């Protein structure tokens, strides 16, 4: 796949981390999550691990429309930010976004199924560099990169205050 603004470099997941292909990730975020989880007002995205990346198939509903027939850029940015956040978690890092760059390459229509992928590119101390994209078929609609700051494992309570994290391989 040819990228325009991102590298596509994917950091290996430590085998001892407990995270494996096929694991569904929605349960680790609180019910208040805007993008994933079981909040009825959310996008209800269902991300899982696939080939060292966080992956989801998703059709943006009409309620996420910006321009006529197109997904609002803020919605696309939120989806990518959330997915990149999940990508830090599968490396056992609990982090927050420090910098987010989104490149809108071609319009993203509502009511069409897309693949959304996110991954960690590099970890440098507390800085975690991530990349993500939204694509249909082999066309990339949106590319994104971000820098997250690792808050440390004690931040688990912030991300999942009502979950027993020991049950989800952390």
Residue ranges and their predicted role:
Residues 128-129, 137-144, 149-152:
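C-terminal binding/interaction regions
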Residues 48-53, 63, 70-95:
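Active-site helix/loop of acyl-thioester processing domains in fatty-acid/polyketide metabolism
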Residues 151-159:
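A short, polar/charged loop-to-alpha-helix boundary motif
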Residues 82-115:
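Hydrophobic beta-strand-centered segment that forms part of the acyl-chain substrate-binding groove
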Residues 1-57, 62, 164:
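Non-catalytic linker/capping segments at the edges of enzyme domains
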Residues 102-137:
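Hydrophobic beta-sheet segments that form the core/acyl-binding groove
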Residues 168-170:
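Conserved small/polar residues in nucleotide/adenosyl-binding loops
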């Amino acid at each position: 796949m040819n990228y325009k603004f991102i590298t596509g470099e994917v950091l290996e997941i430590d085998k001892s981390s407990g995270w494996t292909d096929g694991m569904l990730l929605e349960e680790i975020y609180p019910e208040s999550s805007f993008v994933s989880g079981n909040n009825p007002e959310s996008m209800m995205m269902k991300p899982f691990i696939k080939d060292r990346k966080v992956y989801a198939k998703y059709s943006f509903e009409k309620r996420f429309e910006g321009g006529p027939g197109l997904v609002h850029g803020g919605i696309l940015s939120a989806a990518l930010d959330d997915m990149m956040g999940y990508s830090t978690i599968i490396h056992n890092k609990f982090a927050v976004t420090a910098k987010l760059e989104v490149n809108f390459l071609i319009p993203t229509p509502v009511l069409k199924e897309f693949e959304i992928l996110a991954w960690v590119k590099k970890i440098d101390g507390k800085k975690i560099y991530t990349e993500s994209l939204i694509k249909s078929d082999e066309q990339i609609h949106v590319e994104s990169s971000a820098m997250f700051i690792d808050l440390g494992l004690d931040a688990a309570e912030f991300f999942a205050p009502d979950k027993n994290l020991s049950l989800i391989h952390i």
